[in-house]
Amino acid sequence: DLKFAFETDAHLAQSYGAIKAAIHTSNFIFIPDEWFDQENLSVYTKFMGSERKIYTKHHDELGFNTLFSLDEKVEEKLPENTVVYPQSSPLLALSGHLSGDALLVDFTATSFNVLFIKDKKITFQNHYEAENAEEFNYFLLLIIEQLGLTESVPVYLQGIINEDDEYYSTLLKYFNNLYFFFPAGKQNSELLADMPKHYFSGLLALDLCE
C-alpha cells in the first residue's frame, strides 16, 4: 500500500521539503498556450473523461499546457505536500536534451511511454499498456505507421529494458539506431551504482520538471 509505505519506509517517511510524483493517468490533454484559459478550466472537463479536480502544468519552452486529473484513491495516498505530474512530464522535460528527429521510449514493467520529436518540435506523445513483447510489437507497428518512421530514425531507450530482452529484440526488427538514454543533470543517487543508469532516467528527469 502506497500510503503505508510513506508512513513506514525508512526513506519515504523522512521529512522532505518537497515531493514530486509522476502519476499514470489516462485523463490528460495538451492545450496550446493560445487556446488555454487558466481562469475557466471547467470548459475542458468534457475533453478529460473525468469531472475530478483538473491539474495544470505549463511547459514554458514548448508552448503548451498539460491538463490532467487523477484517481481520488491515488490522491488520498500521497503526502499533502506532494507536487503531482502526469506520466508525460519527465519525457517532455527531457525533450530539450535530444538533437534532431528522435523517438524516446520509456519502459515500465507493464507499459511504455513514447515521445517523438521532428524538426525540433514535439509531434507525438502517448502511453501504452503492454504485458508482453507481442503486445509491444503491435503498438510499435501502429506508431511506426502513424508517424511514418523509417529504420534510420534514432531511438532512445530508458526505463526497464535491456539488450538481452524481447522488447529490445523487437525494436531491432524495425530500427538500426538504438541508444540507451542516460539521466540528465546531476546524479548523486546510490541507486545508480547498483543498477543500469538508464533505468532511472525518467525518475531523475522529475528534477527537471517545474
Regions found by a protein language model. Give the residues of each.
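Small-residue (GG/TT-enriched) beta-loop-alpha framework at ligand/catalytic clefts
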Residues: A13-S15, T56-T150
